[in-house]
């Protein structure tokens, strides 16, 4: 493959250049799952821990996984509700893949805090 990636092969988030893509080699559905997503509650500033699932049907482009990992790490100190974060991730992934938002599905499962588990899906 003759594609130059900015994040892949460069340790640390200083190499982050956005969600990177590569030409779809012919797959129909891609699902990415990570349990490394964290953000903070915008009211209490307490940490929230998530499992995120990103699923899309690629047309011309696929997401490069290292750039997704770095992208998700950027939310570490962001104050955001689970529901808003699911929509933000969906919209930014769709833009990177040049898809309509309806072509990307994001599910965030927030780990229990205060005895309540939240799942927000787009």
Residue spans for each PLM region:
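N-terminal intrinsically disordered, cationic/polar leader segments
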Residues: 1-122
